[in-house]
Amino acid sequence: MRIALDAMGGDNAPKAHVEAAIRAVQTFPELEVTLIGNEEQIRPHLTDTTRLTVIHTTEKIEDTDKPTTAVRRKKEASMVLCVKEVKEGNADACISSGNTGALMTAGLLYVGRIKGVERPGLAPTLPTIDGNGFLLLDAGANMDASPEHLLQYAIIGDAYRRNVYQQKNPRIGLLNVGAEAGKGTELTKQAYQLLENSSLHFIGNVEARDLFAGVCDIVVCDGFSGNVVLKSVEGTAKMVFSLLKEQLTSSLPAKLAAGMLKPQFRNLKEKMDYSEYGGAGLFGLKAPVIKAHGSSDANAVFHAIRQAKEMVDNEVTKTITQKLENGGE
C-alpha cells in the first residue's frame, strides 16, 4: 500500500510531515509513503528513507489562493501532484494539510466522485467523553444542502463507522435546535422524514450541547452548521486549556497540585484532542482523500496517515459505493 502525502501544506511543513511519514512506515511494515514537495526542504528531516519516496516540486498552493483558480493554474503544486498520484494509480490514498477548498477541488477534478454522490462532504471525527468520538458530516465542504444530501451523508457515515470502527449498528443523529421531530428548518424536517424511513439506525434530532456526551456516532448537517460546530470545538478546547494553565501556574500551591495531576491532565488533553482521531475525510470521492488540520503537528499527521491506511485496508470507498447503489442497505 502506498499513500501520497503533501509535504508542503500546513503551518508545520515539511518537518512534521516527514517525521510523521517516518513513524508511519516504522509502525506499518506494509506501508510506503510518497512525500511531495521541495526536496531541499524535505531531505534535512529524512533521517530514514526506508519505503519513503520524494517527488520534487517547488510550487505550492497557499491558504490565500482561490481554490478553483489555484488548482487549474498551479498544476505542479504539491497538493495537486499528491492527488494526481491517486488518479494515476501510484497511490491508494492522499493527505494534505493545505487549503481545504483547493483539496476538495483537486479531489473532484482528479479523483472524481462516487457515482450517485452529488456533493462530497468533509467529515472529521470529534471527541466524546467515552473516547469513541463522533463523525460530523458535513463540516464545511458545502454551505447548503438538500434533505437528500443529508441522507447520503448518513449512508456514507454509516459505511465508514462500520468498516473502520467495526461498529455493528452506528447511531445517526440529525443536528437540530431541539430533540422533537417537528423542530428546525424545512431542511431538517424533510431530512428527518427521509432518515426515519431509511434502514439506518436513526435516533432522531440531536442538539449541539449533547454531542460530546456520546449520544450518537454520526451527526449529519449542512456544511454551514457543521463548520460552526467544528470551530466552536476548536475555540472551546483552546479556552479551557488556556484557563487551566492560567490557574495552575498562578501560585506555588497551584503549581505543586498541577505537578501531581500531570498524568490526569495529559489524559484529558489526549481525550479532547481530535487530531488523535485522524484528519477529516472528503467522503464521496472514489478514493480516500484526507484533509489534516492546517496546524497539524507530526502526531496529527501520523494519525491522518493511519486513518487513510485503515480506509484502504477496510475498502471503505467500495462499501460506500455499494451502500449508495442499494439505498443504504
Curated annotation (Swiss-Prot):
Pfam families in alphabetical order: FA_synthesis (PF02504)
Pathways per UniProt: Lipid metabolism; phospholipid metabolism
Gene Ontology CC terms: cytoplasm
Enzyme class: transferase
This enzyme's EC code(s): 2.3.1.274
InterPro entries in UniProt: FA_synthesis, Phospholipid_synth_PlsX-like
Keyword Lipid metabolism among UniProt keywords: yes
GO molecular-function terms, A-Z: phosphate:acyl-[acyl carrier protein] acyltransferase activity
Catalytic activity: a fatty acyl-[ACP] + phosphate = an acyl phosphate + holo-[ACP]
Cell compartments where the protein resides: Cytoplasm
Biological-process GO terms, alphabetical: fatty acid biosynthetic process; phospholipid biosynthetic process
Keywords: Cytoplasm, Lipid biosynthesis, Lipid metabolism, Phospholipid biosynthesis, Phospholipid metabolism, Transferase
Keyword Transferase tagged: yes
HAMAP family per the UniProt record, alphabetical: PlsX
Quaternary structure and partners: Homodimer. Probably interacts with PlsY.
Family membership: Belongs to the PlsX family.
Role played: Catalyzes the reversible formation of acyl-phosphate (acyl-PO(4)) from acyl-[acyl-carrier-protein] (acyl-ACP). This enzyme utilizes acyl-ACP as fatty acyl donor, but not acyl-CoA.
PANTHER family, per database record: FATTY ACID/PHOSPHOLIPID SYNTHESIS PROTEIN PLSX (PTHR30100), PHOSPHATE ACYLTRANSFERASE (PTHR30100:SF1)
Protein name: Phosphate acyltransferase
Organism: Shouchella clausii (strain KSM-K16) (Alkalihalobacillus clausii)
Source lineage: Bacteria, Bacillati, Bacillota, Bacilli, Bacillales
